[in-house]
Structure formats: structure tokens, C-alpha cells
């Protein structure tokens, strides 16, 4: 699959803006939404692997909706080994955030899973902030986890950029999928079988 076009088999109406970002706030609460019963979009693909809707949920902070998260994964997805599987995570924002704020919060959440030295933290923060756009309510962004390669981010069907580091990518998507997440209810909603 070309990195530019995981949307080659979708309708233009479904080319919404996407992101996987780290705005997961430690004190927030999540509310599970119904599974993907009404989503009629064709499956996403990553390197020829179909990714099917898996689950969705809302990220809330003191009752305020921050974003809605949706997970796509291939058949055979094992949440305990999320970094070994191709997957996609969409976040649709209900609030305004700068790319820099998203990147900094993402690194805080990634450090919940494992220690990250200051040099690597600064490098990853800068790379992520350079790839991500600022977001406002209604913006959706999509992140693809490419095992053994890294993360790719898209908005509106176009590639924003990549962070070509599989360790970064595994930890980044672990913000939502790792058992060490600050949002276990959101994780449960995302990994629920559709």
C-alpha cells in the first residue's frame, strides 16, 4: 500500500480529517459509545491489510467532551500485543488544541508505559508537533500504526507526515491501548469486539 493513499477505496464523503494524538488527560473520565453498528464506510487498509472498525469511545475531562476515539484493527488483533498489529486510530475533536500541546501531552502519556530519556522525549515531541496540525472542534485526524516502521498521520485523506520509529509508534498508540493507559474505560470501549 502506498503511504499516501489508504483511502483509495473510500467515498469522497468519508475523507474527513483525522489524527491520533495524545490529549488523553490523566484525570479524565471516558464514556463508552455503542459499537460501530451504523458505520457503512468500507474498511481502511494498511499495506494491503484490511482494518475493520473495532470500537469507539469518548474522552471526557470533568464531564467535558475532549474527543471521540475510534479504533480499526485487522482480524486477529490482540490488545495485549497492540504494537505487533497494524491498526488505525481516529480522533474527532470537540475542543481546540495546538499541535505543540497535543505533542507534549502525548509524551506525558507515553511515559506512563515506560521511562523515556530527556533527549528522546524532546526529539519525539518535536517530530510529533511538526507532523500534527492545530485542531478545532469537528476536526478529525487519523493515525496509522505500522509495526516495524512507525506512525503515519493523515487528515482529510492526505498524509500529514510520519514518525518513522516503531518504538515511538508502539508507545504512542499505547496511550489508548496499553494496560497502563490513564483511561482504562476508553481502552475497554476501543478494544471491544464489534
PLM regions with names:
Residues 1-13, 17, 21-31:
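N-terminal secretory signal peptides
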Residues 2-3, 36-155, 159-194:
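Terminal leader/tail segments of proteins
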Amino acid at each position: 500500500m502506498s503511504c499516501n493513499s489508504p483511502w483509495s477505496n473510500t467515498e469522497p464523503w468519508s475523507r474527513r480529517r483525522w489524527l491520533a494524538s495524545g490529549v488523553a488527560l490523566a484525570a479524565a473520565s471516558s464514556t463508552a459509545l455503542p459499537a460501530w453498528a451504523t458505520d457503512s464506510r468500507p474498511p481502511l487498509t494498511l499495506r494491503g491489510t484490511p482494518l475493520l472498525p473495532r470500537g469507539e469511545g469518548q474522552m471526557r475531562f470533568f464531564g467535558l467532551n475532549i474527543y471521540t476515539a475510534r479504533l480499526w484493527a485487522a482480524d486477529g488483533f490482540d490488545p495485549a500485543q497492540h504494537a505487533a498489529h497494524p491498526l488505525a486510530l481516529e480522533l474527532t475533536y470537540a475542543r481546540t488544541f495546538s499541535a505543540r500541546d497535543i505533542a507534549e501531552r502525548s509524551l506525558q502519556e507515553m511515559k506512563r508505559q515506560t521511562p523515556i530519556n530527556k533527549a528522546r522525549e524532546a526529539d519525539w515531541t518535536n517530530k510529533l508537533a511538526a507532523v500534527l496540525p492545530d485542531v478545532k472542534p469537528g476536526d478529525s485526524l487519523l493515525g496509522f500504526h505500522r509495526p516495524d516502521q512507525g506512525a503515519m498521520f493523515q487528515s482529510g485523506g492526505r498524509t500529514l507526515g510520519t514518525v518513522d520509529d516503531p518504538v515511538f509508534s508502539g508507545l504512542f498508540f499505547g496511550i489508548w491501548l496499553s494496560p497502563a493507559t490513564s483511561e482504562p474505560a476508553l481502552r475497554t470501549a476501543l478494544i471491544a469486539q464489534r
